[in-house]
Swiss-Prot record:
InterPro entries assigned to the protein according to its UniProt record, in alphabetical order: AAA+_ATPase, ATP-dep_Clp_protease_ClpX, ATPase_AAA_core, Clp_ATPase_C, HslU, P-loop_NTPase
One term of GO molecular function: ATP binding
Purpose of the protein: ATPase subunit of a proteasome-like degradation complex; this subunit has chaperone activity. The binding of ATP and its subsequent hydrolysis by HslU are essential for unfolding of protein substrates subsequently hydrolyzed by HslV. HslU recognizes the N-terminal part of its protein substrates and unfolds these before they are guided to HslV for hydrolysis.
Record keywords, A-Z: ATP-binding, Chaperone, Cytoplasm, Nucleotide-binding, Stress response
Binding site for ATP: 18, 60-65, 261, 326, 398
NCBIfam families documented for this protein: hslU, PRK05201.1
SUPFAM superfamilies given in the database record: P-loop containing nucleoside triphosphate hydrolases
Gene: hslU
Subunit text: A double ring-shaped homohexamer of HslV is capped on each side by a ring-shaped HslU homohexamer. The assembly of the HslU/HslV complex is dependent on binding of ATP.
Organism of this sequence: Paraburkholderia xenovorans (strain LB400)
Keyword Lipid biosynthesis: no
The protein, known as: ATP-dependent protease ATPase subunit HslU
Pfam families: AAA, AAA_2
Length: 448
């Protein structure tokens, strides 16, 4: 679990997301409260439930990006999923219980990786020994009953072994080929199951995956590759699978986070039925999950009482009040995200750690073409993106992808023929490339 303070979390989010201070603070406090709850004594700890968050804002302003970055910071089981993937129980499609099943799979993988890191050093030593046994089969220490004359051979072999171990750790033997027995990876089988029968489908899939598991095959590979394969094999052997499963379930129950995107798409604006699968049915199915229930998974029963749910939606066509009242009540914290201004667009282009400008400069630098963006060029790009959003559909920061792609279309196409060239992107260059398209509203609808 992350031990970062809210200020540290917001600072980390600021590196990738421009503006939206209220949303950042809300998720930062929610994440910190997970840690705070763990410090509370047990009788009261069970009573402290997470305060779920509903983020409301137009498309392209950073809702999904906050989720992506939060997943990396959380250091806890985290799943981002679209509400539109689910259908009401009884219809063809996935039911909402599969959210928890997917989350527990993520937790098992995380827990396994964490436990493997703990035994990594020991596993590496054992893998080195197995490699050295292959490289120096005669240098192994002799057992009981060895003649006294063999002692010198053992000492000499031990010295040689240490020399080879040193060379192995320095990477001097990486390119040498060895032949060894390695465990066959478990090959999964994709099985289509009926809706509502995910547990049975998963058990059948696991049964087929275990067939042939544990068998060894003889392979030739480089020492570097063999060392990695043997280290993974040794580390996996040291793990207690039951302990991993228990920790994974506990981690989901205490620290799990579900980010439910596009929740506005299941908000129904009218009471009349239609040809579509009932949206209200999906909302009703979500209720017990968000409130707290017990879901049966292949790793055991998982309680959802302390899982944090963060929902987001643009709410262009529907309003938060169009959600059924019971579901509204289960998201007590509401945060509105602001539409992006010209200044925000400008900051998105240059101020974030992996800004669009840096990405395109790095891409074209691979062909020895150097892009230099002048300040007035950046400003003009931001103004055009903002203007097109105002005149046509407002798709937020995603408009910048379209605009900059159109701007650099010719440069990217001919990059191979202009090695060593420096391209200066100023306001005049931007106007020449985009003005005609940006000014023509009909054309910009299709091109930008």
């Amino acid at each position: 679990m992350s031990t970062m303070t809210p200020a540290e979390i917001v600072s980390e989010l600021d590196k990738h997301i421009i503006g939206q201070g209220r949303a950042k603070k809300a998720v930062a406090v929610a994440l910190r409260n997970r840690w705070r709850r763990q410090q509370v004594e047990e009788p009261l700890r069970q009573e402290i439930t997470p305060k779920n968050i509903l983020m409301i804002g137009p498309t392209g302003v950073g809702k999904t990006e906050i989720a992506r970055r939060l997943a990396k910071l959380a250091d806890a089981p985290f799943i981002k999923i679209e509400a539109t993937k689910f259908t009401e129980v009884g219809y063809v499609g996935r039911d909402v219980d599969s959210i928890v099943r997917d989350l527990i799979e993520i937790s098992v993988k995380q827990t396994r990786e964490t436990e493997m890191r703990k035994v990594r050093t020991k596993a590496e030593d054992q893998a080195e020994d197995r490699i050295l046994d292959i490289l120096l089969p005669s240098a192994r220490p002799v057992g009981f009953g060895a003649s006294s004359g063999a002692a010198d051979t053992v000492d000499e072999g031990s010295t040689t072994r240490q020399t080879f171990r040193k060379r192995l750790r320095e990477g001097l033997l990486d390119d040498k080929e060895v032949e060894l027995d390695v465990e066959q990876p478990q090959v999964g089988m994709d099985i289509m199951g009926p809706p509502g029968m995910e547990d049975m489908t998963e058990q059948i899939r696991s049964m087929f995956a275990n067939i042939g598991g544990g068998k060894k095959t003889r392979r030739k590979m480089k020492v570097k590759e063999a060392l990695k394969a043997l280290t993974d094999e040794e580390a996996a052997r040291m793990l207690n699978d039951e302990e991993v499963k228990t920790k994974a379930v506990q981690n989901v129950e205490q620290n799990g986070i579900v980010f439910l995107d596009e929740i506005d798409k299941i908000a129904s604006r009218n009471e009349a039925g239609g040809g579509e699968v009932s949206r209200q049915g999906v909302q009703r199915d979500l209720l017990p999950l968000v409130e707290g229930t017990t879901i049966n998974t292949k790793y055991g029963m998982v309680k959802t009482d302390h899982i944090l749910f963060i929902a987001s939606g643009a709410f262009h066509l529907a309003k938060p009040s169009d959600l059924i009242p019971e579901l509204q009540g289960r998201f007590p914290i509401r945060v509105e995200l602001d539409s992006l201004s010209v200044n925000d667009f400008e900051s998105i282009l240059v101020s974030t750690d992996a800004s669009l400008v840096k990405q395109y400069q790095a891409l074209l630098a691979t062909e020895d073409v150097h892009l230099e963006f002048a300040d007035d060029g950046i400003r003009r790009l931001a103004e055009i993106a903002y203007a097109v959003n105002e005149k046509t559909e407002n798709i937020g920061a995603r408009r910048l992808y379209t605009v900059i792609e159109k701007l650099l279309e010719e440069v990217s196409f001919a990059a191979g023929n202009h090695s060593g060239r420096t391209v200066q992107i100023d306001a005049a260059y931007v106007d020449r490339a985009l003005n005609e398209v940006a000014e023509d509203e009909d054309l910009s609808r299709y091109v930008l």
